[in-house]
């Protein structure tokens, strides 16, 4: 319910918080570029020249994707929802069913980034693809129960694809 609570108003409630389309992009890019250079230095021997030459285009595309994430309805997101940052309870009364860890990447962004990262880190590709539409529909249902209106499964799918960096130009 984190996303629903701040849906469309997180920017105003957290004006100093990092935002995907403004304060996050430029500080993040040197890390991407440095990681890419290190990867080429250590593993370049097994990469084709076209992969090695793709770095500038990838970085430019990633900047664009981050900006476009900020053009969506934004809310407060965890920013690093992976299976290893989630603890699942055992269903006993009084225990939280899910606890999120590692809040260092919290920001204001497209909420589907969180869902995209979780589903892609927690399921094998075939299983995820088979049930993605169900997950997105359930997410939209939960938003509606929490008072968010007008967010369709089609919009969720579009935002989800962008959150996965699958909507590059």
Indicate residue ranges for each PLM-predicted region.
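Catalytic activation segment of kinase domains across protein kinase-like and atypical kinase folds
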Residues: 83-121
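Short, intrinsically disordered, charge-balanced linker/junction segments flanking boundaries
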Residues: 1-4, 161-167
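Active-site-proximal structural scaffolding
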Residues: 70, 74, 79, 108-111, ...
């Amino acid at each position: 319910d984190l996303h629903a609570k701040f849906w469309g108003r997180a920017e105003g409630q957290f004006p100093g918080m990092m935002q995907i389309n403004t304060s996050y992009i430029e500080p993040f890019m040197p890390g991407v570029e440095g990681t890419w250079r290190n990867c080429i230095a250590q593993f370049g021997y097994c990469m084709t020249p076209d992969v090695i030459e793709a770095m500038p285009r990838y970085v430019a595309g990633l900047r664009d994707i981050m900006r476009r994430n900020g053009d969506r309805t934004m809310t407060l997101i965890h920013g690093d929802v992976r299976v290893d940052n989630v603890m699942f309870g055992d269903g006993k009364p009084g225990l939280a069913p899910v606890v999120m860890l590692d809040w260092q990447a919290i920001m204001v962004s497209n909420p589907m980034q969180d869902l995209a990262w979780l589903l892609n880190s927690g399921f094998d590709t075939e299983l995820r693809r088979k049930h993605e539409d169900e997950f997105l529909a359930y997410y939209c249902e939960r938003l509606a129960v929490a008072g968010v209106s007008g967010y369709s499964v089609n919009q969720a799918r579009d935002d989800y694809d962008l959150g996965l960096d699958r909507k590059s130009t």
